[in-house]
Curated annotation (Swiss-Prot):
Gene Ontology terms for molecular function: DNA-binding transcription factor activity; DNA-binding transcription factor activity, RNA polymerase II-specific; sequence-specific DNA binding; zinc ion binding
Protein name: Weak acid resistance protein 1
Biased composition, class Polar residues, residue ranges: 135-144, 205-225
Phosphothreonine PTM positions: 128
Record field: transmembrane: none
Stated consequence of mutating residue 640 to T: Causes hyperactivity with constitutive induction of PDR12
Subcellular location: Nucleus
GO biological processes: aromatic amino acid family catabolic process; cellular response to acidic pH; positive regulation of transcription by RNA polymerase II
Gene from which this protein is expressed: WAR1
Note from the entry: Present with 907 molecules/cell in log phase SD medium.
Upper taxonomic lineage: Eukaryota, Fungi, Dikarya, Ascomycota, Saccharomycotina
Function: transcription factor which binds to a weak acid response element (WARE) to mediate stress induction of PDR12 and FUN34, encoding an acid transporter and a putative ammonia transporter, respectively.
GO CC aspect terms: mitochondrion; nucleus
Species of the source: Saccharomyces cerevisiae (strain ATCC 204508 / S288c) (Baker's yeast)
Record PTM: Phosphorylation is required for PDR12 induction.
Amino acid sequence: MDTQIAITGVAVGKEINNDNSKTDQKVSLPKADVPCIDKATQTIIEGCSKDDPRLSYPTKLETTEKGKTKRNSFACVCCHSLKQKCEPSDVNDIYRKPCRRCLKHKKLCKFDLSKRTRKRKPRSRSPTPFESPMVNVSTKSKGPTDSEESSLKDGTSYLASFPSDPNAKQFPNSRTVLPGLQQSLSDLWSTLSQPPSYGAREAETTSTGEITTNNHTKSNGSVPTNPAVLASNDEHTNISDAPVIYSTYNSPVPISSAPTSINSEALFKHRPKIVGDEETQNVKVKRQKKSYSRHMTRSFRKQLQSLIISQKGKIRDISMKLDTWSKQWNDLVEKSMFLPTIADPVSVGIISHEEATLRLHLYKTEISYLSKLPFIKVEENVSVDELRKKKPILFSVIMSCVSIVLTPKQTTRGTIMKLDSFVLNLITNQIFKANNKSIEIIESLSTLCLWYNFFEWSSKTRYHIFNYICCCLTRDLGPTYVNRSFGMFSDEDPKRFKSPLELYSNGASLTLLVYISALNISIFLRQSIQARWSHVTEKACEDLVKETKKSRHYDNDKLLLDSADDPILVQFAKMNHVLENIHTHLHERDLNDDEFDDPIFTKKYLNKLMEKYHKQLQEIFTKLDRNRPRVIAFYYSVEAYLYQYKLAVFIGEMSHTINEKVELPREIMDDFVKCYHCCKSALEEFSKLEPILITSLPLFHTSRIIYTVGMLLLKLRYSVVAIPSFHDLMPLTDDAIALVIGVNNLLEKTSELYPFNNSLYKFRYVIALFCQTYANKVIDVADRYNAEREKLKEKQVIDEVSNGHDGTKPINAYVTESQKMPTEEDPIIDNNTNQNITAVPDEMLPVYSRVRDDTAAMNLNINSTSYMNESPHEHRESMTGTTLLPPPFISNDVTNSADSTNIKPSPSSSVDNLNDYLTDINSLAWGVNSLNDEFWTDLFMNDI
């Protein structure tokens, strides 16, 4: 380590090593009696490189816009140890000239520029379009390796290694970034009503398997433009046995657009901890233990508890798994590259020939045959070698997609990640490099979109990009008007001119599959629909209906799926056509345009549309086979989506009277009942499926089922709980919680059997968010209504004291509301009060039961959301008439009601125990934002 002693007026600089060890950065001070150092004119500067300009040139003290001098960013070692302000003796040369304190006491002034004077919190601002917050990501967890995996042969002729750049600089982590978003969490929390559960903290080294961030700062370091910095520091990930090239060419040069440089999964350690873990944050959002929600009825609390018990810790556990796998996947993709000459995964040794044979067999049987829908057709007797030779791209995609039905005994996660990475590079090379426009590319992209299973977060998915390219290729190779116009130059009749997709034997089926997948993906991501119903899809349906086995010209080869399944595909496509119309003409309507229209005409027009779509769905339903539960479940989800629109419009119109009980129109009540029965039927049909049928479901199919779960829980069930006008429909939705728990348990069972289906984990994560959001919002409604009830009681007492008997005058204003409430004679409520948690008992509304005398009511704080504005005097009078059924732990007679005030809730249903299963608000906010604006967010009603 060299020590540089400069001439008079120049600081003595010390060069430190470029490693991260703090011990290497420390250098011994020169002795005070060294004759070459003048304490009055020279200083010692540590912690900067040899070519740092602060060593050679004077540094002026910064000034503000108003001309005032700023405080020095670095204090000298002496002032820093004394915690005193360091004032430079020369404001035009603050580092090379001693400070006033050292100059006064004739001490040697030394500056350590390798560390800051304090830990600064990052500024809460969003990055500009010209900059992007960068972080260096490293991990101690080993990559996906396994002794049983197929090792690749060394010395492959077309593979060469590209060493990483050793001069790649590092840069500090300046902010916490949401997964896949250029926005800091501090910016997000500022828009929420809850305070942030964590602030900007220095990153710390975590245990094995956790992700850490690099905090050391290089003085005068700038963000490097060399893309090798994105892949040069991870030396612990063991993926050397993959046939990949470690190259700097894989990372994009523009840092702001690097797909994985801002690795959202690497920042998972900054997420707020879930309730139940050790508290490590300075600020923690917790629900107050002294909450009005303890006065819910026992059955309501027990059923609510059964819901969130089933989801306890699921958000944390699933997100940790997704985070770990996504980190490994991104590392592998970021650092690997397969040359275009690579044809298939068998030739490079990612999977063996035996495993490829197994995967192809599973695709033919478990995915294609059992699906009862003619997806991408493969001949039954085609072998691995034949498919590799004829359609190597489709073969590679099939090998990747079949991972969803494999068990741990059949493959490993490391092999799957290598295979997915290979497919990603192969597809990219064929589309963007080789410019390959063929039917095989359409088949490959369509298959990939149907069973997309890459290990990545929702905010990092690429299937919508593949879907867009697939739609473009379908238009290019399909019967477009461009192809028709060029037909006039041929010898054939232009009307008989056929496009490549029309000439292909499975062209009609492929056209409908692209339409179905593209439509659902567009709705799923709330994007503009890429493939709409047109004359092309209409003609494809007609061709499939007329098609026979003989017209396919397969004399010796037998197709796995013959023409008998084509009518099912046609009906499924028409069902999606109705879904497209419902989404486009109803859910995506611009309500602002209605301001200029006649409301009566608009209402009639919408009613006619709904009647038309309902009639079309009924015609399709009569042609469906009742023994196909997956198709029937999809149908019910579409029909529920139809009725959901009218309910959403009605709730939006009554937002100003949302807390008042008004009589529901008959048509709204009927639509609510129909919507609930459709949701219930869809989930019941889905529950009939075996795990193998669930794991082989396409992405678009499962997404509609999960959306139906959220609609049932957060739209329908929450409406009868929170909106007084829907209270009378409470008995109808009593089995909603049991259905949600049943679907969740079925998905968990399927995930245990097929742990490599990453989409199942994502859907379980969404259901966990649904359940936790529902529980939090229900308790918030209970607290809010009871708090307002207490305020009204206090106001009533003050009015009675101040005005005497005049205080009872406004009471009669609420008599009408009390007469509209349900009575004790409701047989559905009376029959559901003695169920236990395991059987998922009926969940009472937060319509908290009333007792006969005022003392018991005041002690128990029991009230009703529908009686929120009711006075104690009216409360006593209304008990003589029709009244609401009391909760199970309060008797109907006065004596038992008074004695019940001393009964304590059981530990299994106490509100404190209930709060232990709730996830904090910040975690829910993070989870919702990580869904990348998917259509789940439409289900959260924040205005109720």
